[in-house]
């Protein structure tokens, strides 16, 4: 029985590689400077990552999010020396109560710029990101990241502009423009010290409706979650299509697209393997660089899927067009 399962697994993976070949050919012109990427926000081990085969690694600046767990410049250099591009996760739309900047007094004496706790993510609080007090906190965070030797920053909660519009605090256009301006300020700040620093926003790609072209020209790429699947459930085609319109526009301007869907339930079932491969096929067909994360949303491990992720077998194909 186990022999039969192995044979079927090989068939499934082989079919995926065949379809991937045709996918690469059909998506000629996509800007895809990396074959793969890693997204791990807890317990990331620089030594393990350096020999993993992943080309770009989005990790937290700290092993456990705390100040005491900060990676040393020497640890980040291990990845750089191995040819891995280390990118630091930074939440610019919410304050996190386990970070070095958090003050216990804020629980009872809330600053004007600090909003409500996000019910979906306990310990995360919406912030009025256009306030100078918050910007100064973020810039101090970025100083640490730059000093550590990271090669890029991964800016989360771009979509928080929608929250403040829905709360009626400011108009949607104003909220979007303030977030765009903040990202532009961040890019200018970090690139004064490191001109080649990658700037990668995550989600909230519809903010481009309010962009005059500066944001699209400034970012290095864009990252998206849940583009094709919501955990293990496939999304409706029209829902995906509405987001892809923004991403394709960015990609055609020479910006790479990182995609992470939480499709892997951790089992070796054929259903799980087929779902992961389906996600990969859809992502690559639409110009995205995929990462199949565990469906528990924890991002607390390097999710290596034998024969699939990182997709070493796909590295032999050289038919992509780079610009």
Curated annotation (Swiss-Prot):
Classification via Gene3D superfamilies: Aldolase class I (3.20.20.70)
Q: Which Pfam family, any one, appears in the UniProt record?
A: Glyco_hydro_114
Q: InterPro entries per the record?
A: Aldolase_TIM, GH114_TIM-barrel, Glycoside_hydrolase_SF, TM1410-rel, TM1410_Glycdase
Which protein are we looking at? Uncharacterized protein TM_1410
Origin species, per record, is Thermotoga maritima (strain ATCC 43589 / DSM 3109 / JCM 10099 / NBRC 100826 / MSB8)
